Swiss-Prot record:
It comes from the Bacteria. Gene3D superfamilies: Acetylglutamate kinase-like. It is found in: Cytoplasm. This is Acetylglutamate kinase. It comes from Pseudomonas putida (strain ATCC 47054 / DSM 6125 / CFBP 8728 / NCIMB 11950 / KT2440). NCBIfam families: argB.
Length: 301
């Protein structure tokens, strides 16, 4: 076999650049929220699984939290169950909650676990109900217009927020060289199920584990300024300024708030990364430039 010197040189250069990052993150926990386009393309799905296995192989401890909104929507449509959204949250009645559990805890979770294991990992699938991994309570949503004297309380059904995370379970799995893959379903005080935003679950898991990084895969290149340029490194103070001046708005606000809360809760850095880019997770961790936006309390890159 003829050696392609240019290709070999490129591989050596990549490995050389990655080495200091590998040393820095050995033994550290990284929480990755997996969703969006990265879950829909077969090539990107395979690349994500290989990235997770490689991270574990070099001594990093990945914990995966996944979404599944499009898959839930598809099954609801086939079952002729209409979907309604309030402030970006799916109104989840009992019938919808059954579908959410079926899709997230069954189909999506097991597909991810199987893919990671096929590429040499030891993934184990969980929902927040397993060993009360994610204790939750009903999320209260209110709305007030100038004409109202008091806020209107809106019932959005079985939509929840995280109360606590069973870190003993996750630490046991990580120490046993397993890769936890978590479906964002919480359990209430009376055993009831709650549908929770996957970004929020990932953020709270990262906080509870005091993770090195929280990584949120998205369908955009990262946070952008008003000229459309990606902001590669920001402090929490700078992010708050961008929210105040309207640079960050709309659908990105909940994701950014999750990233901010994680950093303020003890996570070293949060990352908004482009899940459409092959090997996005590895590129963000192991290269100088990364492929998204890093948010930290330290001096940004």
């Amino acid at each position: 076999m003829t050696l392609d010197r240019d290709a070999a040189s490129h591989v050596a250069e990549v490995l050389s650049e990655a080495l200091p990052y590998i040393r820095r993150f050995v033994g550290k926990t990284l929480v990755i929220k997996y969703g969006g386009n990265a879950m829909e393309s077969e090539e990107l799905k395979t690349g994500f699984a290989r990235d997770i296995v490689l991270m574990k192989a070099v001594g990093i401890n990945p914990v995966v939290v996944h979404g599944g909104g499009p898959q839930i929507g598809d099954l609801l449509k086939r079952l002729s169950i209409e979907s309604h959204f309030i402030d970006g949250m799916r109104v989840t009645d009992s019938a919808t909650m059954d579908v959410v559990e079926m899709v997230l805890g069954g189909q999506v979770n097991k597909d991810i676990v199987n893919l990671i294991n096929r590429h040499g990992g030891s993934a184990i699938g969980l929902t927040g109900k397993d060993a009360e991994l994610i204790r939750a309570r009903k999320l209260t949503v209110s709305r007030q217009t100038p004409e109202m004297t008091t806020p209107e309380i809106i019932d959005i059904g079985h939509v929840g927020e995280v109360v606590s995370v069973n870190t003993d379970l996750l630490n046991m799995l990580v120490k046993g060289d397993f890769i936890p893959v978590i479906a964002p379903i919480g359990v209430g005080a009376n055993g009831e199920s709650y549908n929770i935003n996957a970004d929020l679950v990932a953020g709270k898991v990262a906080e509870a584990l005091k993770a090195e990084k929280l990584m949120l895969l998205t369908n955009i290149a990262g946070l952008m300024d008003k000229q459309g340029q990606v902001l590669t490194g920001l402090t929490t103070e700078q992010v708050n300024e961008l929210i105040a001046d309207g640079t960050i708005y709309g659908g990105m606000l909940p994701k950014i708030k999750c990233a901010l809360d994680a950093v303020q809760g003890g996570v070293n850095s949060s990352h908004i990364i482009d899940g459409r880019v092959p090997n996005a997770v590895l590129l963000e961790i192991f290269t100088d430039s990364g492929v998204g936006t890093l948010i930290t309390n330290r001096k940004p890159r």
